[in-house]
Amino acid sequence: KKIKNKLQNVTYINSQTSDKHFWEEELVKLNFEPDVVFHLGEYSKITPSFVDTEDILNSNYIGTYNVVEYCKDKNIKIVYSASSTKHSEDSGNESPYAFSKKKNVELIKNYSKWFGLKYAITYFYNNYGPKQDTCNDGWETVVSIFEKQKKAGKPLTIVSPGTQKRTFTHVYDTVDGLIKAWERNENDEYQLVGNDECSILELAEMFDCEYKLVGERKGESKRIIEKKLVNYTKKVLNWNATHKLKKWIDRL
């Protein structure tokens, strides 16, 4: 299977973290001794998670357990991409996806207590940026969806009521935060939050084209940004988002 966006000097393995064959045979053949594991590869869709419960089980539970076990056995740090859904009105219980991400944070922290696992937990907020339009499964981030709809000359579809607010972070800022979280020699949590917060209606208006409201989605809820953790993240990582959402949209 051809892998898109393939980089030079990088070895790709087309497998699943839930697959024992990957851990016991494929990875062993590489004789690979990593310094860190950036665990970013999980099932990451909110609404479909009510249907795709088996995928959630395999990817977010079995898969992440295998990654955590690997890091424990190798005595290396795991940098985990948690979800901002944990910081919501329902405390991360509003969907199977959100619940799985919250439980994985607990798993990692407990492995640190029980076995000395080194970790950095990072919370993502609506990433956007280059190549976001390469995803074609229908459940992209809202900025990517709006970009595709605008290029196709279609009205933007806004999930009702449209007044719900979201914070947006450019992928380059997120990557910068991930690297700094790895380099900091502490077990800690970090909110990689951009400086652009707006309602979905306000976001649509930035695209300067027609839009329409569609029905509410199951599992969506109001995010609560913990300002103390945001300020703490900026301080201890010496990190701050530098990209602007409006500037990105204007270039499309």
What do these predicted regions represent?
Residues 96-98, 106-166, 171-176, 182, ...:
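NAD(P)-dependent short-chain dehydrogenase/reductase
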Residues 18, 51, 59-62, 95, ...:
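Residue-level signal for the nucleotide or nucleotide-sugar donor/cofactor binding architecture
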Residues 90, 130-133, 201:
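Short beta-loop-alpha junction of Rossmann-like oxidoreductase domains
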Residues 150-252:
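C-terminal substrate-binding subdomain of Rossmann-fold SDR/epimerase-dehydratase oxidoreductases
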Residues 1-127:
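N-terminal Rossmann-like NAD(P)+-binding domain of SDR-like oxidoreductases, especially those catalyzing
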Residues 22, 26, 56, 100, ...:
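Hydrophobic alpha-helical packing elements
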